Amino acid sequence: MGGRARSILRWLRHHRSRRVSSSSFHLTTTGDDTVKDLHDPRREDAEGDGWEEVHEGPESDPEEYIALVSEDAGTHLPVRTEPRRMDPSKKEPDFFTEYGEANRYKVSEVIGKGSYGVVAAAVDTQTGERVAIKKINDVFDHVSDATRILREIKLLRLLRHPDIVEIKHIMLPPSRREFRDIYVIFELMESDLHQVIKANDDLTPEHHQFFLYQLLRGMKYIHAASVFHRDLKPKNILANADCKLKVCDFGLARVSFNDTPSAIFWTDYVATRWYRAPELCGSFFSKYTPAIDIWSVGCIFAELLTGKPLFPGKNVVHQLDLMTDLLGTPSAESLAKIRNEKARRYLSNMRKKPRVPFTKKFPGVDPMALHLLERLLAFDPKDRPSAEEALTDPYFNGLANSEREPIAQPISKLEFEFEKRKLAKDDVRELIYREILEYHPHMLQEYLRGGDQMSFMYPSGVDRFKRQFAHLEEGVSKGEKSSPQLRQNASLPRERAIGNKHGDDEYHAKLNVGEKPCHASVTDGISKPLMSARSLLKSESISASKCIGEKPKQDRDQEDSLTESMDETADEVSEKVAQLKT
């Protein structure tokens, strides 16, 4: 056992006596009532994600803890949270008008809703696994939103890795040419890294190292497939109580092909400013590389170390000022690569700033961690390591193992031919339908044989949900509790072929961080869950995490008021720099 693994064990033993509140990270089931604890998120209003925060039930004790459980040690790693509790008796009708108990999924409650859809926590009755089901409403009202959904479900099908959120199933629509909504089933994650950072001021160096390792391992896989995520930030990294992380929200991701024009590749780039690489703050460099994601990883790592965003810029110019305040004035070589003349002139005329030693900026932090952080935050992208190179840094000695770091093959250009042409609504509908069939192999074979079936001979899951839960909606509207109507003589939905999943058990065993199952037991096909349904899906992205139960506006701190926003495109940014700082 390595030194860092031993230190985790000592930490666990030291905290053995600390008890965990009953309203922790777990889902507590008593009879028909389900009580779920939810985080208070920092709402990202400026990003316009469209989610309404649902406030139900009393506010929980802010000193309660989330239990990060190690089965080997039999102890808890306490992580503070400030949850709110949703009243389990109030099941929102918005979801159940379209969705309810079909043969496979037992819905427990609605856990999120917004302009783009509704999310429910459910149990897969075949496996006992807890899942999150997102119903995305009116997918094709806007072709741009539908294209983003198509891109994301395609990438999440092609990128299968333990550090990337997984789509488990997509329900077959009732009609090939007329469907409007889609139902996507995800593995259920409990929270996101933003909430973990915000709720904890006592994360250990082992946490920092473990989190960064998983993030870089995921990016190694993603970049090997020639994919750039383009929107990495703590809210787009899901987290579980066993300290496992998973990257989500691939709605802005792009596959890089050698013949992809830079102007086309970055036309719609609007990633969150605080985590945006300097070359994206003013169309700096003629060719973008995976180094844009590496910069974001560095910003996230710094936030893990300090508990605060590293570069919380109020606008693009302020963002550049914060970067140069820490990293110093860029070198002449770096400035020469800036293609926007006015942006280049602004930085060239900037007063000379010395580089701040990272030991001063981050006092008390492991020197090896700071050395790697400096590499990740190099101003010039050519000076940043690749994810694969970063994993060989001495900081990960005794932890990194290439056998646990699979890489993907580059994605075929044929998968993303749709990016090169203007799509009509019916085009996107057909492409999304084709992606859905990947989870219904029997129907896919018929489709590939040239079948032109417009509707299906057996009831689709969506049809059954509408029919079976009409009574539940009526009961909820009257303030009554209602149980889902049991299915009678409906055929089972087509099952997707189950592939092997990448395992990570050996790695967790080495770190003495045990795998915590998503359920304790299965009785009559329904699990008795241990975990809270915290991974909510926001906005037009189908996989991003969004917790509900927001703090009252007057209670938000100054940091929360500086919410990062989805910003201008690169060209607009250049013009803004020119106007403000000519």
Swiss-Prot record:
SMART domains: S_TKc. Keywords: ATP-binding, Kinase, Nucleotide-binding, Phosphoprotein, Serine/threonine-protein kinase, Transferase. Residues 482-491 have a biased composition (Polar residues). A motif (TXY) lies at residues 267-269. Activated by threonine and tyrosine phosphorylation. Residues 105-396 form the Protein kinase domain. It catalyses: L-seryl-[protein] + ATP = O-phospho-L-seryl-[protein] + ADP + H(+); L-threonyl-[protein] + ATP = O-phospho-L-threonyl-[protein] + ADP + H(+). Dually phosphorylated on Thr-267 and Tyr-269, which activates the enzyme. Induction: By ethylene and infection with rice blast fungus (M.grisea). Residues 557-572 have a biased composition (Acidic residues). Disulfide bonds: none annotated. The modification Phosphotyrosine is found at Y269. ATP binds at I111, G112, K113, G114, S115, Y116, G117, V118, V119, K134. The keyword ATP-binding applies. This is Mitogen-activated protein kinase 17. InterPro entries: Kinase-like_dom_sf, MAP_kinase, MAP_kinase_CS, Prot_kinase_dom, Protein_kinase_ATP_BS.
